A protein has these predicted regions:
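Conserved phosphoryl-transfer catalytic core
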Residues: 95-122
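Short, amphipathic alpha-helical segments
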Residues: 80, 91-102, 128
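Charged catalytic cores and adjacent phosphate/nucleic-acid-binding surfaces used
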Residues: 2-29, 43-81, 90-93, 172-186, ...
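Flexible, glycine/proline-enriched loop segments at strand-loop-helix junctions
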Residues: 87-96, 121-124, 160-161
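Conserved acidic, metal-coordinating active-site core of Asp-based
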Residues: 127-189
Length: 275
């Protein structure tokens, strides 16, 4: 069993990279990847650890971009986390998204909600703030009772306090990963709620720009969707990957390795990636 989609406190997870490794070992995984949002900060910490010889680790990232008027995510595996252009672009994206967070904070404060940057950072000024941090703060302040309520009432794309992320072209995203020596993979293709036809066209278009794989196995994918993605993966000669999309207590129903229970990502997929 492997898990190629995991988030730590370096983005919107609630466990540190070291704690992630401890959980991976406790689960007896064959291999894993850390794929924090728009940052490679956790990779060095994991590489500095004394990992078991039989545990495979592949550096990763999850980058947000835009397609068909919606936000999509592209995973990058085997990236050179020291690549200058990669880090320059990530810093630029983070600066723009930091301003987006300030804009959302201002909207909340105008309506009297006690949302501040300090509360969102929760003691870590270097954290990459996402809407999950807003949800956690809304719950901590007693404004919402759950993450689902926070997103449906305050943070969803049609909500008053939502501010879109700065546009990032998927072609540029793919090129960024490729130029950093990485393997670009479309994350959770069915989570964007495109039609089957649009999803297939998206995969086809991205393949022409350098997409190398699709995330077939994911906590949100049911067996019918997995079967469909397997079909498209073979049709377009792409790699298959999979992972839980673990975020710790921010998504408490998702566990490393097993997702919501039935998830099983075959071991050979990490070997395919590494080869």
């Amino acid at each position: 069993m492997i898990d190629l989609h995991i988030h730590s406190t370096c983005s919107d997870g609630t466990f540190t990279p070291k704690q992630i490794v401890q959980k991976v070992i406790a689960k007896g995984l064959y291999g894993f990847s850390l794929t924090d949002h728009d940052t490679v900060d956790g990779i060095l910490e994991i590489l500095a650890m004394d990992l078991p010889d039989d545990l495979k680790f592949i550096p990763g990232i999850e980058i947000s971009c835009d397609a068909l008027h919606r936000e999509i995510h592209v995973l990058g595996y085997g990236i050179n986390y020291k690549d200058q252009q990669l880090n320059h672009t990530l810093n630029m994206l983070r600066d723009k998204r930091f301003q987006r967070n300030l804009d959302m904070i201002e909207l909340f404060q105008k309506d009297g909600y006690p949302i501040t940057l300090e509360k969102l950072q929760n003691g870590d000024p270097h954290t990459v703030i996402t809407r999950a941090h807003f949800a956690r703060t809304l719950i901590a302040e007693g404004i919402c009772s759950s993450t689902d309520q926070a997103f449906s009432k305050y943070l969803g794309e049609k909500c008053k306090y939502y501010v879109p992320k700065p546009f990032f072209d998927p072609k540029d995203c793919l090129r960024l990963i490729l130029d950093a020596g990485g393997i670009p993979v479309l994350a959770h293709p069915f989570l964007y709620k495109f039609s089957n036809e649009d999803t297939k066209h998206l995969i086809q278009d991205l393949k022409e720009e350098g997409l190398a794989g699709i995330e077939v196995y994911h906590s949100s994918h049911h067996i019918g969707q997995i079967t469909k993605l397997r079909q498209w993966q073979k049709e377009y000669d792409l790699l298959a990957t999979g992972g839980s999309d673990f975020h710790g207590t921010n998504k408490p129903d998702i566990e490393i390795g097993t997702g919501r229970g039935p998830l099983f990502v075959p071991d050979h997929l990490i070997d395919d990636l590494m080869n």
